[in-house]
Amino acid sequence: MRQIAFYGKGGIGKSTTCQNTVAGMAELGQRIMIVGCDPKADSTRLMLHCKAQTTVLHLAAERGSVEDVELEEVVLTGYRGVRCVESGGPEPGVGCAGRGIITAINFLEENGAYEDLDFVCYDVLGDVVCGGFAMPIREGKAQEIYIVCSGEMMAMYAANNIARGVLKYAYSGGVRLGGLICNSRKVDREIELIEALAEKLNTKMLHFIPRDNVVQHAELRRMTVIEYSPDCNQADEYRALAKKIINNTDLRIPTPISMDELEQLLIEFGVLDDDQKIAHLIGKTEKELAPV
């Protein structure tokens, strides 16, 4: 069994990419479980055609303990037999959502939820912002990390940060970076830019997903593109990505770069203006722009 995780900047399309890719993998006969590691509990809605499934933490809070929760109450079967679980999280402003991930994964392991699977896919909230959200990496649960990004500055910044998290636990836990998945935002020279970032991070751009309105049309119906419009070009893009992940053996220890190197890359591709141009635009000298 392979355990993989999808990380990336909040709002980049991780859950959509994860579920559509898993649908493609299931089409190819893979036995898969999605574990949603996000308090929003939206990691399985396209597979189950529902708003949000009941989470492990919600049921544990209702019952008083996670030991009082039954596996079949939180593991639901979705599109093409994909098993779906949501870890959930506490009420806003109370407690640690990262603890929900830890509790849920331990519960699943202890109750034999991972038996007879080819893949477990963790869909993890946003950046590596705290130890709890890094838990699938830190505890050696996820062995392959796929970073969903785009040619936008903050998406690339997040990708570099996530690479730092992978590097931190690469030697102790054996986790590796499987590649970058570019979920296009139609940024100029986006493919070249992500390929350049991938090279600097000692990885590759595994796949470029073009922007297509059919993704939103499918989501409005709580379906993956592969189920909603199986013959469209976008469905084939997700199938291609699914095959690449299944066949991927090129797993590497990343080499994250400094903020200065990242900014220089963005300047080189015209995403950011250099200090001279910014100084000219705001009527200051480069010296005045320098950090104190």
Swiss-Prot record:
UniProt keyword Metal-binding, yes or no: yes
Binding site for ATP: G8, K9, G10, G11, I12, G13, K14, S15
Named cofactor requirement(s): [4Fe-4S] cluster
Stored PROSITE patterns: NIFH_FRXC_1, NIFH_FRXC_2, NIFH_FRXC_3
Pfam families named among the record's database cross-references: Fer4_NifH (PF00142)
Matching Gene3D superfamilies: P-loop containing nucleotide triphosphate hydrolases
EC code(s) of this entry: 1.18.6.1
Subunit and interaction comment: Homodimer.
HAMAP family listed in its UniProt record: NifH
Function: The key enzymatic reactions in nitrogen fixation are catalyzed by the nitrogenase complex, which has 2 components: the iron protein and the molybdenum-iron protein.
Name of this protein: Nitrogenase iron protein
Species name: Synechococcus sp. (strain JA-2-3B'a(2-13)) (Cyanobacteria bacterium Yellowstone B-Prime)
Lineage: Bacteria, Bacillati, Cyanobacteriota, Cyanophyceae, Synechococcales
